Amino acid sequence: MTLAFAPFDWSWLVYPLLAYLFYHWLRTDAFGAFIHVWLFSLGMRLTGICWIFFSLYFHGGSPAVFAVAIIVLLSAGLALFPATVAYLVTRYCRVNDLIRLLVVFPGTWLLAEWTVGITLTGFAWMQPGYTQIDWPLAGYAPVFGNHAVGGLIAVCAGALIAVMKNLMSWHKALILVGLIWGTGFALKQISWTEPAGEDIEVALIQGNIPQELKWKRHMHRSTLMTYRDLTLENKDVDLVIWPETAIPDYKHRVPAYLISLRQALRQSDTDLLVGLFIKDLDSGRYYNSVLSVNGGEYRKRHLVPLGEYIPLRSLIGFFNRWIDIPMSDIDSGPDDQALLVVAGQPVGVSICFEDIFSRDVRRDLPQATVLVNVSNDAWFDGSHESRQHHAIARMRALESGRYM
């Protein structure tokens, strides 16, 4: 299943693989359904999110066995959601096989994926809808969202098995799939939003500071100068954007640096969004943040468990003994934050994996006319994580009708 996602992009593969799952699901009892769906989901997630190993082992100093164990436990836990729903549906839902294939199984899969994204902190990563970003079904995303795209994939897969099991004639299945795809194609031709204001020119700055050096104190000045020089070389734009934690330090420790940047960019009337940490000097709490040098800031609301904070610290505090991730005791920002206004546009900002949650992006709409996501995917350098993240960002842009 992972091959259907970026960077492989064998998008067509999601249809026969879901059909294969539905075929075995249809033939078994409730316990068998649980096992089949759990194994299918486990395999998808083990191969799909194996990039977590890169951050834990190469950059977090974790023993390899511990890093692998974390990935296996996370994947196994996430796989329980669709498996449990499959068990309950198979045991208690008494309908004919055609309805099961076209309605019950797709609805069950959709419900399970939605549940994975909202339970505890949520981890809405390997969702089938992301495989269709360049396909006709993506036309449904601006109207119904990514989950609907995944549900329609499942309906098409169910129709394939219905034909194989002689529950539906091939021409009826072709009409059904044709209507789904044709409607998606038609919806994709519609522009659901209109331009607001003048076009703005944006420069994205990437300092390419190796992750293993980024947090070293001797690299601090070099990092600041690298970003300053790159910015001044590209200042003839409306907006410059730096990555997440481009400055690996607190805002209150670099005031002169930020002031000098604002002054240097004033003549060209350029705004700058900077990724760094902001510390509340009264409470001692600190936040993964983005600020505009011309005023305004955003503090990350949806934190990464085990990376930015330790959930259930009293129970799993031992985690800190096995892994060393810098700045991993961060606080979440308030829900009701004002939008940043940069280059004359209200901007919806997200940091790192916040953009995998469509509900988090939607709360800045419709006021935000532009979406900005800043990330430090160097934690996963050498893996396919950044390509998967890029596909997810494209889906958020498609859903919202905004550039990201």
Residue ranges, per PLM feature:
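Membrane-embedded alpha-helical bundles of multi-pass enzymes
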Residues: 1-191, 232, 382, 393-397, ...
